[in-house]
Amino acid sequence: MEVKVLGPGCAKCTEAEKIMTAAIAEAGVTATIEKISDFQQIAKFGVFSTPAVVIDGAVKCVGKVPGKAEALAWLRN
């Protein structure tokens, strides 16, 4: 599983990355997590509001920090 957190490095983006990292550990899934801060790469996902979370190429969340329960649901499905 490949998880990407998109954002310029703001506080909310950092929080989203921490939540996704904790959710991966709690779910017990094998996943890599990548932080993408380059706006051209972010735009390729059709994302224009950050933070955003992408899992295996699918945009799951845009413009908000996901809740841990929400993140766990994405990882388990």
Model-identified regions with their sequence ranges:
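Local sequence-structure signature of Cys/Sec-based thiol-disulfide redox active-site neighborhoods
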Residues: 1-22
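Terminal leader/tail segments of proteins
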Residues: 2-3, 30-37, 73-74
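Non-catalytic, surface beta->alpha helical segment in thiol-disulfide oxidoreductase systems
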Residues: 55-77
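Structural micro-motif
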Residues: 46-53
